[in-house]
Curated annotation (Swiss-Prot):
Entry annotated with the keyword Transcription regulation: no
Free-text comment about domains: The presence of a 'disulfide through disulfide knot' structurally defines this protein as a knottin. The cysteine framework is VI/VII (C-C-CC-C-C).
GO MF term list: ion channel inhibitor activity; toxin activity
Protein known as: Conotoxin Cl6.10
Disulfide pairings: C43-C57, C50-C61, C56-C65
């Protein structure tokens, strides 16, 4: 029973952290100056060809980086 409670608490904590990081990502998309230089090093900019979202600076890929 204690193990179940601990596991439920851990899952809830992870869910809250995921929501918090998603909000931060959306906030940084609105203001690109908030992104760290390390995060954008080597990423592709708007209009460049991409195969996966992780290649783009803001992680939006539809054959080309959207942002």
């Amino acid at each position: 029973m204690k193990l179940t409670c601990v596991l439920i608490a851990a899952v809830l904590l992870l869910a809250v952290c995921q929501l918090d990081s998603a909000d931060a990502t959306a906030y940084m998309r609105k203001d690109p100056s908030l992104r760290s230089p390390k995060r954008t090093r080597g990423c592709k900019t708007k209009g460049t060809w991409c195969w996966a979202s992780r290649e783009c600076c803001l992680k939006d890929c539809l054959f080309v980086c959207v942002y």
